[in-house]
Amino acid sequence: MLDAQTIATVKATIPLLVETGPKLTAHFYDRMFTHNPELKEIFNMSNQRNGDQREALFNAIAAYASNIENLPALLPAVEKIAQKHTSFQIKPEQYNIVGEHLLATLDEMFSPGQEVLDAWGKAYGVLANVFINREAEIYNENASKAGGWEGTRDFRIVAKTPRSALITSFELEPVDGGAVAEYRPGQYLGVWLKPEGFPHQEIRQYSLTRKPDGKGYRIAVKREEGGQVSNWLHNHANVGDVVKLVAPAGDFFMAVADDTPVTLISAGVGQTPMLAMLDTLAKAGHTAQVNWFHAAENGDVHAFADEVKELGLSLPRFTAHTWYRQPNEADRAKGQFDSEGLMDLSKLEGAFSDPTMQFYLCGPVGFMQFAAKQLVDLGVKQENIHYECFGPHKVL
């Protein structure tokens, strides 16, 4: 526990943190990667280049300072970050490195004096221990469950299937021939790659796209413009190649009773975790209402349409609606979308009038903000809306 003086000292630095903004974390990362370049093998350097990770870390530091006397308020954020950390295989000793550079950054940017540095040192130590302990629990859970493992495990690509102009699915089975750990629908795999020509090892998280079967995993990858890893997977990864995987993780998952109605809302590649949820509901014979609402640019980039249709046929109460923002002539001829333009949920209000319905959202942040606002305006409670950001977390 932190004493009152330490808490007061840390909270007194909040205005300075807010004024400085992500410049603080930019300095921190530049310093850390200069002194500890080996950490480039762990961090997603693409998120470093576009600034997303710097913004996310700054928001986390500011949130911690603001809630330092109320740590339970931070537990949902801690769980999200701890789950992600396990896919990077973060170890306790790396927290010492981060703490060293955080304090050095505060000193170099602000020269706040030893009292402030000592207070932040204590505060960081408390937070680091929260993460270390939770991550140890997750590592132990992953290693002890049936088909689970520690660290990375070699998997072979057994199928590679283009699903649209931008999305390709990969089916993976363990090289050792053993069983694989089950997961909750909505969770992701940690994929570790360092092909020839890559300056650093790259680690990515890709959502699992079907119900667990104990034999292997399926992920789907969108080709991102300029994306080093996604383009390598699309262009160079082949059936028979071996990649390293970390056990499934993630705090975004579906957990509902048989009589709970569910709405799955997605845009683009955001449908990937929703596919695992829909597959799980279909194979469980879910009796309550299930809605599938999806937005895509057009039919060329709309993946898994046939699979969704087939799964929906096995559900007794299923409604699907697809929006194409800019349908092409082939889309119009085939009639494979329901509405043109942006997703407008107000026209489907009757499909989710049940107050117990749970809503799961995934897609670009702007899309999720747009969809969540519509839901709230239609009377949906915030606690019934669950969402996942690909990349560093952002609040809707």
Swiss-Prot record:
Where does the record place the Globin domain?
A: 1-136
- Superkingdom, taxonomy of origin: Bacteria
Looking at the UniProt record, the site noted as Influences the redox potential of the prosthetic heme and FAD groups sits at K84, E388
The GO annotation for biological process reads:
cellular response to nitrosative stress; nitric oxide catabolic process; response to toxic substance
- Spell out the SUPFAM superfamilies in the cross-references: Ferredoxin reductase-like, C-terminal NADP-linked domain, Globin-like, Riboflavin synthase domain-like
Gene3D superfamilies, A to Z: Globins, Nucleotide-binding domain of ferredoxin-NADP reductase (FNR) module, Translation factors
Reported cofactor(s): heme b; FAD
* Entry-linked InterPro entries: Cbr1-like_FAD-bd_dom, FAD-bd_FR_type, FNR_nucleotide-bd, Globin, Globin-like_sf, Globin/Proto, Hmp, OxRdtase_FAD/NAD-bd
Q: Which PROSITE patterns match?
A: FAD_FR, GLOBIN
Q: Which UniProt keywords apply?
A: Detoxification, FAD, Flavoprotein, Heme, Iron, Metal-binding, NAD, NADP, Oxidoreductase, Oxygen transport, Transport
Residues bound to FAD are Y188, R204, Q205, Y206, S207, C389, F390, G391, P392
Q: Which residues bind heme b?
A: H85
Where does the record place the site Involved in heme-bound ligand stabilization and O-O bond activation? Y29
Entries under Pfam families matching the protein: FAD_binding_6, Globin, NAD_binding_1
Residues given in the record as NADP(+) binding sites: G268, V269, G270, Q271, T272, P273
Q: What is its EC number?
A: 1.14.12.17
Q: What does this protein do?
A: Is involved in NO detoxification in an aerobic process, termed nitric oxide dioxygenase (NOD) reaction that utilizes O(2) and NAD(P)H to convert NO to nitrate, which protects the bacterium from various noxious nitrogen compounds. Therefore, plays a central role in the inducible response to nitrosative stress.
Entry domain remark: Consists of two distinct domains; an N-terminal heme-containing oxygen-binding domain and a C-terminal reductase domain with binding sites for FAD and NAD(P)H.
Q: Which HAMAP family match?
A: Hmp
> What family name appears in the similarity comment?
Belongs to the globin family. Two-domain flavohemoproteins subfamily.
Specify the protein name: Flavohemoprotein
Species name: Escherichia coli O6:H1 (strain CFT073 / ATCC 700928 / UPEC)
